UniProtKB/Swiss-Prot annotation:
Example GO molecular function: tryptophan synthase activity
Source species, domain of life: Bacteria
The gene coding this protein: trpB
Pfam families noted in UniProt: PALP
PANTHER family listed in its UniProt record: TRYPTOPHAN SYNTHASE, TRYPTOPHAN SYNTHASE-RELATED
HAMAP family: Trp_synth_beta
Lineage of source species: Bacteria, Pseudomonadati, Pseudomonadota, Gammaproteobacteria, Alteromonadales
EC number: 4.2.1.20
Entry-linked InterPro entries: Trp_synth_b_CS, Trp_synth_beta, Trp_synth_beta/beta-like, TrpB-like_PALP, TrpB-like_PALP_sf
Protein name: Tryptophan synthase beta chain
Modified residues (N6-(pyridoxal phosphate)lysine): K86
Catalytic activity as recorded in UniProt: (1S,2R)-1-C-(indol-3-yl)glycerol 3-phosphate + L-serine = D-glyceraldehyde 3-phosphate + L-tryptophan + H2O
Organism: Shewanella woodyi (strain ATCC 51908 / MS32)
Subunit annotation: Tetramer of two alpha and two beta chains.
Length: 407
């Protein structure tokens, strides 16, 4: 028996080998006790305030909105120490690990942001740190790999499968099954087996709680919609959690449409997946006709995940949240637009949410307040974007030469 409900409607659960059940139950017990312990909460809040830099700003954009009727606010998780929302829940889980007497942390990472956050928390709290990362992601996120190593983490490239986030998740889980007596698996998103989706949501919910307080101070009312990108779904559930009971506020998650939803090159399981079992949970999954897990794709490594957290699946099924998608090209355009119009370089992940917000703003016919969760900063993505833009410029120049040669 679990102390907390392991399901969100039909989604969630604990689909893990029997060997991991004691570890998950120990984690759940520690979490429930910590939530009732004032000393734990005080230490966590102190770290968030005096180490990570909370509360983060809620910034009203000056030039981003294409429509005078629409105000677009950004919740500035990019300003958090570590550069993304990941730091919030990592500090919470690292404190939990210490509470359980663990000496070592195992983690997985895609874009490297969760790895960096884990490495900084381990350095701060004197824990050994091991990070599994898909070999492809190691290549495309070299600045973050160096950051992790600089802070004392061991980064292990994963070459199995598609060499991306899902394979890193599998390897991390495999390692944990043989070492949970001394190690804690610090999962990086609101997915996986219970109690991880609940733990991650609770350690991220200050995003929405702060946003609610800040927007009421600024506008005297709640926003019409809050918008966040969705890979596994931790930044989005952190933003949504405090608004779920506010029926007037639309909750909008934006999945990566990659090269297009009508192609196999996307990462949008909520809209285009089938329910299956993966990574210890029942959730929407990108699967082929044989039920095998398909490779997901996104320009942003942090959204390149073939499934999604169970609470998002439940929010979609009940209609409380809607899930849209943005293509690579739309995210790239939004990435450049925010940089040019506001002097803020967003993570490519966050740019998916921005792209959809701008689209919503264009279509609005009445006064509207939108809040976008700017989940991370884009330093890690500048080389990826530069390469793509240079390549496009070259092919455009080549095309123009070809056309002028045909005149």
């Amino acid at each position: 028996m679990t102390k907390l409900d392991p399901y969100f409607g039909e989604y969630g659960g604990m689909y893990v080998p029997q060997i991991l059940m004691p570890a998950l139950k120990q984690l759940e017990t520690a979490f429930v006790e910590a939530q009732e312990d004032e000393a734990f909460k005080t230490e966590f809040n102190d770290l968030l305030k005096n180490y990570a830099g909370r509360p983060t700003a809620l910034t009203l954009t000056r030039n981003l909105s294409p429509n005078p009727l629409v105000k677009i606010y950004l919740k500035r998780e990019d300003l958090l120490h570590g550069g993304a929302h990941k730091t919030n829940q990592v500090l919470g889980q690292a404190l939990l690990a210490k509470r359980m007497g663990k000496k070592e942390i195992i983690a997985e990472t895609g874009a490297g942001q969760h790895g960096v956050a884990t490495a900084l928390a381990c350095a701060l709290l004197d824990l050994k740190c091991k990070v599994y990362m898909g070999a492809k992601d190691v290549e495309r996120q070299s600045p973050n790999v160096f950051r992790m190593k600089l802070m004392g983490a061991e980064v292990i490239p994963v070459t199995s499968g598609s060499s991306t986030l899902k394979d890193a998740c599998n390897e991390a889980m495999r390692d944990w099954s043989g070492s949970y007596d001394k190690a804690h698996y610090l999962l990086g998103t609101a997915a996986g087996p219970h109690p991880f989706p609940t733990i991650v949501r609770e350690f991220q919910r200050m995003i929405g709680a702060e946003t609610k307080k800040q927007i009421l101070e600024r506008e005297g009312r709640l926003p019409d919609a809050v918008i966040a990108c969705v890979g596994g779904g931790s930044n989005a559930i952190g933003m949504f959690a405090d608004f779920i009971d506010e029926e007037s506020v639309k909750l909008i998650g934006v999945e990566p449409a990659g090269l297009g939803i009508d192609t196999p090159m996307h990462g949008a399981p909520l809209k285009h997946g089938k329910t299956g079992i993966f990574f210890g949970m029942k959730a929407p999954l990108m699967q082929d006709r044989e039920g095998q897990i398909e490779e997901s794709y996104s320009i942003s490594a942090g959204l390149d995940f073939p499934s999604v957290g169970p609470q998002h699946a439940h929010l979609a099924a009940t209609g409380r949240a809607t899930y849209e998608s943005a293509t690579d090209d739309e995210a790239l355009e939004a990435f450049q637009l925010l940089a040019r119009s506001e002097g803020i370089i967003p993570a490519l992940e966050s740019a998916h949410a921005l792209a959809y917000a701008v689209k919503m703003a264009k279509a609005a016919t009445q006064e509207t307040i939108l809040v976008v969760n700017l989940s991370g900063r884009g330093d890690k993505d500048i080389f990826t974007v530069a390469d793509i833009l240079e390549e496009r410029e070259r092919s455009q120049t080549g095309q123009q030469k070809e056309e002028s040669g045909n005149d």
